[in-house]
Amino acid sequence: MEGENDPLLGSYKPKRRRSSLVYGLSRPQFLDTAASEVSPIPQERPTTSLRKPTPRVQRPATDVSYGALEETEENESIASGLSVQEDFNSKAWWKELTLLIKFATPVVLTSLLQYGEVVTTVFSLGHLGKTELAAASLSNMTATITAFAIYQGIVSALDTVGTQSFGSGNYEMVGLHLQRILAILLLIQFPIFLIWWKIEGILLFLRQDPLTCMFAAKYMRVMMLASPAYALFEALKRFLQVQGIFHPVTYILAIVVPINIFLNYLFVWSPWVGFGFLGAPVAVALTLWSACAVLIIYIMKVNGRQAWGGFSREALKNWGPLCRLAVPGVIMICSEYWAFELVTFASGVLGTTELASMSVLSTTSTLSYNLAFGVAAAAATRVGNLIGAGNTKLAKLATHVSINLGAAIGVIIAVILFLTRNTWTYIFTSDKDVVALVATIIPLVALINIADNTQCVAGGLLRGQGRQRIGGVVNFIAYYLLGLPVAIILCFKLDWGLYGLWIGIGAAILIIAGVETWCSLHVNWDHLVELANRQFDEA
């Protein structure tokens, strides 16, 4: 079969099946950018695809659609070996920035739409009564810290093996890694189901209100229907993202979120088929399974199938390299989730006003974090693809641009929060005590968000570089050996209250931002390419 050699890799690459409707790319724009900017890097790499590779169709290097860069003098300067600092004012720098923003935007919208599903549930059940509202909030928190955050940590391994495999042209390896991820997610459903089935006793042990625990236990048992769907959706979403396909998930959620609102009304409030409190988790389960079904149809019929080589028994073997990325990814993500939940729990000890204020501040911080998370996801895909392609110069530039973009977003949001500190809280509540308390603390939270946005992007870069272990270790030490102890001491021993809690958690975030940013920027890029090659061989 005829084919051509890729100038980046010097070896045959498999052909991708081209879709008639292109939301992503037949060849990722991330790699077209690389091909147009970098002089050929001759290197031999053994093909690790399970099947005999077929030639890949390569679009012209001068194609500027979907973010590909034009051939310019600035691009040539990168290829000729100029440092990244010397190119920061070049057209290539701004093209890189535009590309990241373009692909971060749908990820941000996706995160906000997914968050909207939770808001819909809380809003719907909140009108049934305060016990139902408390039970829904407690259930959502429990589901997040015992399952959903773990799923996100596991699928984050695709940020490394998926992006690098796709960047190297080993497209079907992405599908193989996806199958391994799905197998792991399936296995951990069983211990999670056991915890959820016995959750009432666990919550009572933690001294929660007995009536709230009873409602939460019923809610969690119904949510067992939604748990596999959430895991599948996260895996499929990441499967598309590592291919540079970002928009379809946003479009799908834009369709199913209104459906979720309708189902909440139908199952919770409708006089014909509504059955009250338990109607909300049923609506969540149906919404998630519907989203999965549409996403699978999109992949098989429109775009994304090019990285799916079919089911293989190889997916049941050689989980070691994947687990070595997934475990620190879980620690990296769950450490942050759990730390914030513990701080929220501690604020409840201070009183109702403090708990309500913490809720406002945490929600504000989450909204800010979602913006940075979009940049982190795009940066992980971008850098991982470029490492897989052997394009270290452009990977270095993308890293610098990503860090600067994350910090800039944090600064902009900090300024907005500072200027609206006396009015922002009225979006959530009109309680004067809560408004006054939030107004005194939100300048501190605004400053913390600068570091939080930066560390979020740096964490994404570490995942794209395959260095999750650094993030896992740094997050655990910063939050649990420094941040939380300091927060508890300042809050309860020195009576600094909510201010002390945020100083403690802010100190942890500042350390994480500094260490992870330094690590993501100071990299032996050639060594990362060698590690990627080694992972291909192991897989």
Curated annotation (Swiss-Prot):
Superkingdom of this protein's organism: Eukaryota
Taxonomic lineage: Eukaryota, Fungi, Dikarya, Ascomycota, Taphrinomycotina
Presence of keyword Membrane: yes
Pfam family, one: MatE
Protein name: Uncharacterized transporter C4B3.13
Compartments it resides in: Vacuole membrane
InterPro entries xref list: MATE_euk (IPR045069), MATE_fam (IPR002528)
Organism per entry: Schizosaccharomyces pombe (strain 972 / ATCC 24843) (Fission yeast)
Location, primary (coarse class): membrane
Record-stated family: Belongs to the multi antimicrobial extrusion (MATE) (TC 2.A.66.1) family.
BP term (GO), one: xenobiotic detoxification by transmembrane export across the plasma membrane
Record key words, sorted: Membrane, Transmembrane, Transmembrane helix, Vacuole
Record-level GO cellular component terms: fungal-type vacuole membrane; membrane
